[in-house]
Amino acid sequence: MNPAFKFCPSCATPLALITQSEDGGDKARLRCPACGFTHWNNPTPVLAAVIEYQGKVLLAQNAAWPGKMFALITGFMEAGETPEGGVSREIKEETNLSTDALKLIGVYDFQRMNQIIIAYHAVCHGEVRLSPELVDYRLFEPESVKCWPAGTGYALAEWLKSRGHTPQFVEFPKRDS
């Protein structure tokens, strides 16, 4: 449930958690008691790219991230575009690279962010020029790149397996409970 969604976009009445009968039975959702609007809270489609550039894997560091984490190029689909068109657009916007070939790696749920990740392998060319949202990039040999145990890290692992590599995962320090 997205707690940030508090008011009806149709009439501005505060939303309430209201249980109603739906096709699958009774379901509690944020609904407008005044006009009946339902906030479905559907997952958001996110596009991700394992970029193969000059025979290596390109990972980038987002300006908003703490530390030195590098990850796949990702972004949201725009209305009216296909996933393939969207991932090519994101690659161009964020790295200035042109996409020569795309192949679907897989679709992954990312429950923590209420997202569905649609991941592609993209063979790209051109001169890397990062957008302001990225601060750095690195090129990794496929056999030495490390995956992360969440979201797009699983897409990278799947692509590595398809290339005959055994994925290695970064181990994050355990948080105190």
What kind of region is each of these model predictions?
Residues 46, 52-93:
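Conserved Nudix-box catalytic region and its N-terminal flanking loop in Nudix hydrolases
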Residues 108-129, 142, 159-160:
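Active-site-adjacent beta-strand/loop module that shapes the phosphate/pyrophosphate-binding cleft
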Residues 130-161:
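NUDIX/MutT-family hydrolases
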Residues 158-177:
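Charged phosphate-binding loop/patch that engages nucleotide di/tri-phosphates or the phosphate backbone
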